């Protein structure tokens, strides 16, 4: 085993780093099922957080590093010591981080979980990126409901819907999210579609004419060249009535002539897993969300 002090962390040229990342990580850890090799490179080509790990004046790995977070790690053959690479990165990130907050790794390769644990990390959850081909299907909505497009004036009602729905989730980290967190999530949606020049007509709100409330939402933006579902909720009082299927079928049909597939993220153990499987979604990758107190 090498002496940890013999390693160095050096800033990388983002475009060059992105080429290595695409080859040494994405070819074996399919996080996004990118539409092209170029898009894998372009995703990081203008960022400012790409780093090399150096040993004996040779690049042996790379990572995307910010205070309190590192991700996208990869090794460069013939170096394959993931345990040491993770240890080196953990020690370095601790020196640039806020000691009041944890260090997180949001995309840990499942095969490396034990190595992260060796460096003091805990596995909080496993997330799965899922994908489904767009398709055409007939949609019949009951008379008491109607589809609407989300607008900023709906933000407060959407936040209430999110809060009331996610509070009933079977996963604690979701169920304990605050109302303020959901307000922020709604804001992120509107900001993201604006920055990506995405129409709000990609997204769906379901309005109940009887209660005069929004009871469902499927918000969609563009991530890595494909539509990506940011939030998908149906109010607990209206679940198991076919509304979720109708919203997702509308979304899959909407993109049938313009995009080959849509993607979303789900946490393993979430009740929604079975629903997405029923609609034809398949997992692209499983990645661990790790955290460590400094």
Language model features with spans:
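Conserved donor-binding loop and adjoining core beta-sheet/short helix segment
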Residues: 12, 34-96, 216-230, 236
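Conserved acyl-CoA
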Residues: 84-100, 246-261, 277, 282
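Acyl-donor-binding surface of acyltransferase catalytic domains
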Residues: 1-2, 79-145, 149-151, 288-292
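Conserved hydrophobic beta-strand within the GNAT/NAT acetyltransferase core sheet
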Residues: 102-106, 229, 262-266
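A conserved beta-strand-loop-helix scaffold within acyl/acetyltransferase catalytic domains
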Residues: 34-43, 65-69, 172-227, 232
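A short beta-loop-alpha structural element at the N-terminal edge
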Residues: 2-20, 146-173
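Short glycine/proline-centered loop/turn elements that form peptide/ligand docking sites
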Residues: 244, 248, 269-272, 291-294
């Amino acid at each position: 085993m090498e002496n940890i002090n013999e390693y160095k962390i050096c800033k990388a040229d983002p475009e060059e780093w992105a080429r290595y990342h695409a080859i040494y990580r994405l070819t074996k850890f399919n996080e996004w099922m990118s539409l092209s090799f170029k898009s894998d490179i372009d995703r990081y080509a203008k960022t400012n957080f790409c780093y090399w790990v150096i040993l004996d004046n040779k690049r042996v790995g790379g990572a995307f590093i910010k205070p309190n977070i590192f991700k996208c790690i990869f090794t460069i053959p013939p170096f394959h010591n993931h345990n040491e690479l993770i240890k080196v990165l953990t020690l370095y990130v601790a020196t640039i981080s806020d000691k009041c907050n944890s260090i997180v790794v949001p995309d840990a390769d499942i095969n490396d979980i034990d190595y992260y644990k060796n460096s003091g990390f805990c596995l909080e959850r496993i997330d799965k990126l899922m994908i489904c081909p767009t398709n055409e299907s007939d949609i019949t909505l009951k008379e008491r409901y109607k589809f609407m497009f989300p607008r900023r004036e709906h933000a407060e009602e959407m936040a209430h819907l999110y809060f009331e729905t996610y509070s009933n989730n079977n996963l604690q980290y979701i169920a304990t999210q605050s109302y303020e967190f959901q307000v922020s999530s709604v804001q992120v949606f509107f900001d993201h579609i604006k920055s990506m020049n995405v129409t709000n007509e990609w997204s769906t709100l379901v309005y109940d004419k009887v209660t005069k409330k929004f009871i469902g939402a499927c918000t969609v933006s563009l991530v890595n060249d494909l539509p990506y579902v940011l939030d998908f909720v149906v109010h607990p009082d209206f679940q198991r009535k076919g509304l979720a299927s109708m919203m997702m079928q509308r979304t899959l049909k909407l993109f049938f002539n313009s995009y080959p597939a849509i993607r979303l993220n789900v946490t393993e153990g979430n009740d929604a897993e079975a629903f997405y499987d029923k609609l034809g979604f398949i997992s692209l990758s499983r990645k661990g969300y790790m955290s460590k107190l400094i």
